[in-house]
Amino acid sequence: MNRYDNSLSGLKLGQKTEYNAKYDRTLLQPVPRRLNRDDLGISAQQPFNQGADIWTAYEISWLNPKGLPQIAIADAEIDFRSENLVESKSFKLYLNSFNQTKFASPAEVQDTIRRDLQDCVQGEVKVRLNSVAFYTHQPIHELSGEIIDNQDIEISDYGFNAELLTNCTCDVQVEETLVSHLLKSNCLITGQPDWGTLQIRYAGNRIDREKLLRYIVSFRQHNEFHEQCVERIFCDILHYAEPEKLTVYARYTRRGGLDINPFRSNFEPVPGNFRLARQ
């Protein structure tokens, strides 16, 4: 068992677990970011200087001081510079532990989640608790950019291959945004499918759309966490296309009442958390 396997062996993901309905901050489990970043050759000097893992938590409930159940939806933004990412099933179990616990106010719930996540990931975390009414005037969002999915190409190999991006540019300078709804990877632990929409914004030599789409499709049988996939895509495009500016943003469909939306960039700030049609 290697160092990576040792670090992941204690995670609750993929294991039979009991649901604790009483608040328990120890349920949160960290995964060191350095494990995957070492594999990508990312040192302390990271190729991106803006970024976050943007979570939406749809299943939050607790009891008010009189014992009446309360509900909310939360946005959580975990800074990319944090030492750890949070394992998704442990986050779900942690949130479930609020179900039969009394809190004085929604603000106390929000502050508790923020504090516990910061302790888990060892970095900056922003949390905002929203009422259901907040979403009444929040329309389904669409990521801006040119869709590259409708290409008439034949694909027979679905193994991950970064070399599909070899010689992927031409000597035409552009600033453009490309979008694909065909991102699909698999959970590193369970192998369950993770479905996402990918946005790539860059400035530099024009990237060949066919090669880029083949590369995206090659994640189809690749096992890695959401955050790790986005950082891998960022590093591969930076290596093969050498853009002057680059943003990689993926919005994944929800599982277990949570969706994860990693954002990495070397030139623009983290966007707001706006739900797509598949979310």
Swiss-Prot record:
Its main location: cytoplasm. The active site is at C187 (thioimide intermediate), D194 (proton donor). Its EC number is 1.7.1.13. It is found in: Cytoplasm. GO terms for molecular function: preQ1 synthase activity. GO terms for cellular component: cytoplasm. Pfam families: QueF, QueF_N. GO terms for biological process: queuosine biosynthetic process; tRNA modification. It is an enzyme of class 1 (oxidoreductase). NADPH binds at S88, K89, R255, G256. Signal peptide: none annotated. Catalyzes the NADPH-dependent reduction of 7-cyano-7-deazaguanine (preQ0) to 7-aminomethyl-7-deazaguanine (preQ1). This is NADPH-dependent 7-cyano-7-deazaguanine reductase.
